[in-house]
Amino acid sequence: MKTITSTSSMDRTNLLITLILSALLVVLFFAIPDFYPRLILFSLFSVVYVVIYGYNPTSYSLTEDSLLLNSPYKKISISLNEISAAQYLGKSNAFSMIRTFGSSGIFGHWGYFYSPRIGKVKLYARRNNHWILIHTLHRGKYIIAPDDPSFFDELQSRLLIEKVE
């Protein structure tokens, strides 16, 4: 089986939130008259933006035996044997979830969240649609959001093949 990859791009909502927050930071930067507080603000938010961007997914890949969540800093590999179920959630809203650690809004959603409906979940999504909930045997639940909705169908077929073999 060949490797299937789907990009992970921001939808309009997350792009708008990122642009608005960035614009507010620029306004705040110029509103501070003193150099050192301005430098501290710039340094702090530069680090925050770089960290958040680095952990947000850029793509998802299905290899012969694993699902890969690719980000600039880290590649998370989940063995297909480890996945017990995958469920297509479609359009969802991370803002209805409780963020326990991570980021929501700037460059998408990344981190640990809690949902009364789903429970604890690790969210790696740059968009609010095409959400796929992945249940693993020992690593908890993940939500991913590939750009290509057919990625879910390919994941399901590989999970079925994996279980038959």
Walk through the language-model features, giving the residues of each.
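Short, aromatic-rich membrane-interface segments at the entry and exit
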Residues: 34-42
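Alpha-helical transmembrane segments
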Residues: 23-27, 45-50
